[in-house]
């Protein structure tokens, strides 16, 4: 019975490409089948302006709500309260995104955060950069990286196979959705702020893409970008 309900929920969540009416040129190219791989969009530096593009090209994308909080701001008529949701999305195979959404209700806030996370999707570099391992398989990160958001700073370090994700719950969720299985982390600042913590981890993963490597170094580190086949 539980399996049938899970299958029905999966069918409801399945993206219907035929019913989708794209608003941008890239969206139309995706629907027509001209673009069939999201890595093409990212390699060309084309803008992701519709979350439906990600739904169509990455059907195995998973979502995880990291935090929902009630926030307030002052207005001339008094205090105004809204819900703020922080969400991470990823396919556990080289793609990850982090987003935040606000609304008067929890549901719309989470949906806004999911859409924002899909639009901020990046390709993640994975590999084996630990001197203790050197297996050459893409289970960790290829080299150390740093990221920051607000007062939070995160440093990611390659770890040997079997160590797992030595990180806080928020960083562990982001790294797991990115497809990183083994890594050490160092954190500084007020990590209780969930969005800043998630965004700093996301920034560190993004900074991996700006390191230049020679072909022989890529082979030694087992460096892979995006989806691992």
From Swiss-Prot:
Record's comment describing the protein's domains: The N-terminal domain interacts with the head of the 30S subunit; the C-terminal domain interacts with the body and contacts protein S4. The interaction surface between S4 and S5 is involved in control of translational fidelity.
Keywords, in A-Z order: Ribonucleoprotein, Ribosomal protein, RNA-binding, rRNA-binding
Assembly mode: Part of the 30S ribosomal subunit. Contacts protein S4.
Biological process annotations from GO: translation
Name recorded for this polypeptide: Small ribosomal subunit protein uS5
Residue ranges of every copy of the S5 DRBM domain listed in the record: 61-124
The UniProt record lists the keyword Lipid biosynthesis: no
GO cellular component: cytosolic small ribosomal subunit
Gene: rps5
MF terms in GO: rRNA binding; structural constituent of ribosome
One Pfam short name: Ribosomal_S5_C
Organism from which the protein derives: Methanococcus maripaludis (strain C5 / ATCC BAA-1333)
Signal peptide range in chain numbering: none
Record-stated family: Belongs to the universal ribosomal protein uS5 family.
């Amino acid at each position: 019975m539980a399996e049938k309900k899970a299958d029905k929920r999966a069918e409801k969540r399945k993206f219907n490409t035929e019913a989708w009416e794209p608003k941008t040129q890239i969206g139309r190219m995706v629907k027509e089948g001209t673009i069939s791989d999201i890595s093409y969009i990212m390699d060309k530096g084309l803008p992701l302006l519709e979350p439906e593009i990600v739904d169509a090209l990455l059907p195995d994308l998973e979502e995880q709500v990291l935090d929902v909080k009630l926030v307030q701001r002052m207005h001339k008529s008094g205090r105004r309260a809204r819900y703020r949701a922080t969400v991470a999305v990823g396919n556990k195979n080289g793609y990850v995104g982090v987003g935040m959404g606000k609304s008067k209700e929890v549901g719309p806030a989470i949906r806004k955060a999911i859409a924002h996370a899909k639009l901020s999707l990046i390709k993640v570099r994975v590999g084996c950069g630990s001197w203790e391992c050197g297996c050459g398989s893409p289970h960790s990160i290829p080299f150390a990286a740093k990221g920051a958001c607000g007062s939070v700073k995160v440093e990611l370090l390659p770890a040997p196979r079997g160590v797992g994700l030595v990180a806080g719950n928020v960083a562990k969720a982001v790294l797991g959705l990115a497809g990183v299985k083994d890594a050490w982390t160092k954190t500084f600042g007020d990590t209780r702020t969930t969005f800043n913590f998630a965004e700093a981890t996301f920034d560190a993963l993004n900074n991996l893409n700006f390191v230049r490597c020679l072909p022989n170094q890529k082979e030694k580190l087992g460096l892979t970008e995006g989806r691992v086949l």
